[in-house]
């Protein structure tokens, strides 16, 4: 009689213990935010090695931490400069929905920081960030489309992108917008008998 009761108690204890263990710190958004904030604090006082360590500890579950790791890899802050690893980390954060990471990745590809400049590869990342309202990405994507460096020129889309950046207060976008040729006048509809 004691054996089944003891076994039931042990099973209940194990189930309770296991369910309590299933909730790890990785599952706690508040803890992740506290860790992230401590990384920001370390970065702000230029303790880059500590900031990099902190952001790296949560980069598997926080896209902003991924982006910060990428930025630090890009600049060589708190770690060795590694543009290729920065691009990979920016891509992960951008795929996680962070427009800033998409803008940063597009900028790196456009400038050729990890290889030759590649406006064609940069354009989709910049367009994604621009569609989320990122003004620098809108300006850079507009330039690519205005100049036709990634394919055919597209002045109509460049104009829209420059407008996004100009609306955010970017003077260069305002100047580029003003320098574009006027939009072609719409032709009146043709009537057919």
Regions found by a protein language model. Give the residues of each.
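N-terminal leader/linker segments that initiate helical-solenoid repeat arrays
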Residues: 15, 20-60, 64, 193
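Hydrophobic face of amphipathic alpha-helices that form TPR/SEL1-like repeat modules
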Residues: 35, 41-42, 57-58, 66-75, ...
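Alpha-helical adaptor scaffolds
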Residues: 71, 75, 84, 88-132
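Short helix-capping/linker turns of helical repeat alpha-solenoids
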Residues: 30, 43, 60-62, 75-77, ...
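Alpha-helical solenoid scaffolds that mediate protein-protein interactions
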Residues: 57-58, 93, 129, 165
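Terminal, low-structured helical/coil segments at or just beyond the last alpha-helical repeat
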Residues: 152-155, 159, 163-193
